[in-house]
Amino acid sequence: MIEYTVKVDDRNYFWYLNGKRHREDGPAIEFAGGTKEWWLNDLRHRENGPAIEYAGGAKAWYLNGVIYSEEEYWNQLKPPKELTVEEIEGLLGYRIKVVK
């Protein structure tokens, strides 16, 4: 089990692990006004939804500290598509040569 350091400042909660904002089982920052932020290793990050949920309902999508539009975010989480050389050639419309 992970042991976090939780700091409370004027009803705002901040979770830390080894001095970095970090929490794996929920938001690492919970503001008294309702905004929540997910952090891992001091980077905004969440793989199952927005990394920031603002109290007013707006959302921001981050992976490893990089902000994405919602569409870009979900595309980043899709597994890479595996293609054969023949499939790639079919998509490109011409032959390719694999080099190493």
Protein language model regions, located:
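Short, low-complexity, charged amphipathic interaction modules
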Residues: P79-K100
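Glycine/tyrosine- and acidic-biased, solvent-exposed loop/turn segments at the edges of beta-strands
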Residues: M1-P80
